[in-house]
From Swiss-Prot:
Transmembrane segments: 5-25, 33-53
Keyword Membrane: yes
GO CC terms, sorted: plasma membrane
Membrane-topology annotation of the record: Multi-pass membrane protein
Cysteine disulfide links: none
Originating species: Acidovorax sp. (strain JS42)
Protein name: UPF0391 membrane protein Ajs_0703
Family per similarity comment: Belongs to the UPF0391 family.
Primary location group: membrane
Alphabetically ordered keywords of this record: Cell membrane, Membrane, Transmembrane, Transmembrane helix
Domain of life, per lineage: Bacteria
Subcellular location: Cell membrane
Length: 61
């Protein structure tokens, strides 16, 4: 589960970088939405991993 948190964090950073560098005006709005969505997912998966819920329990043991 921690693997997914890292993946979501990387995706959010890439989406933000592509949207805020002026690649295209339309991609900035999409990047903002994707950044928020994947950032929330990354934080959620980190919290779940710290609590030992789901697949993170097996990864820790």
């Amino acid at each position: 589960m921690l693997k997914y948190a890292i993946i979501f964090a990387i995706i959010s950073l890439i989406a933000g970088a592509l949207g805020f560098t002026g690649v295209a005006a339309g991609s900035a709005a999409i990047a903002k939405v994707l950044f928020v969505v994947f950032l929330v997912l990354a934080v959620l998966f980190v919290v779940l991993a710290l609590l030992g819920i789901g697949a993170a329990r097996k990864a820790i043991k």
